[in-house]
Amino acid sequence: MRIILLGPPGAGKGTQSERIVERYRVPQLSTGDMLRAAVAAGTPVGLEAKSIMESGGLVPDAVVVGIVADRIEEADARDGFILDGFPRTVEQAKALDAMLAEKGIALDAVVEFVVDENALVGRIAKRAEETAARGQPVRKDDTPEVFKTRLDAYKRQTAPLSDYYAGTGLLRKIDGMKPIDEVTGDVTGLLDGFREKATS
């Protein structure tokens, strides 16, 4: 099972991907973790990424795709993986598609968590209030202002992926506003269907 998770910050991707990992025993691949691991392991793409990051540059798509390519060759990812946080742009999606096609690997689905923006901002504001009421420091990215900025960046950069993957026939939308366990039920219902198809 090979899937990509999409959705704005605060949509519950983290919680759902943990549950998918637990249920289906496939690794969650986060580009940040993969970059750090590749740098630590001293792989050719890791060394390239390291020199770019040390000079303060942004790691180009080709290098990130190279790191993803190396990671999905590892034993634990052979039967499937969850990509979370990548691709972020249509250009990255196209580069990922080309790399997977070269390896003869097909994605099963792109799961997008659809949420109401105003409700999301309200959810974050409530979380910040509750944290402050407990006398704990509020995380900087948990303030409504910062969250709104992250949401705007997502809409500008990543939201077009929804149209891109809809065009490939891979996009599946899940209502992320339901209670967490109901969302999990919708996700597992969808993924169980893919698994049955793969084994039949």
Curated annotation (Swiss-Prot):
- Start and end residues of each stretch annotated as NMP: 30-59
Sequence similarity: Belongs to the adenylate kinase family.
Q: Which residue ranges are recorded for the region named LID?
A: 126-142
- What name appears for this protein in its UniProt entry? Adenylate kinase
Q: Which UniProt keywords apply?
A: ATP-binding, Cytoplasm, Kinase, Nucleotide biosynthesis, Nucleotide-binding, Transferase
Task: Give an example GO biological process.
Answer: AMP salvage
HAMAP family in UniProt: Adenylate_kinase_Adk
Task: List locations, semicolon-separated.
Answer: Cytoplasm
Provide the assembly information.
Answer: Monomer.
Q: What is known of its domains?
A: Consists of three domains, a large central CORE domain and two small peripheral domains, NMPbind and LID, which undergo movements during catalysis. The LID domain closes over the site of phosphoryl transfer upon ATP binding. Assembling and dissambling the active center during each catalytic cycle provides an effective means to prevent ATP hydrolysis.
Q: What is its EC number?
A: 2.7.4.3
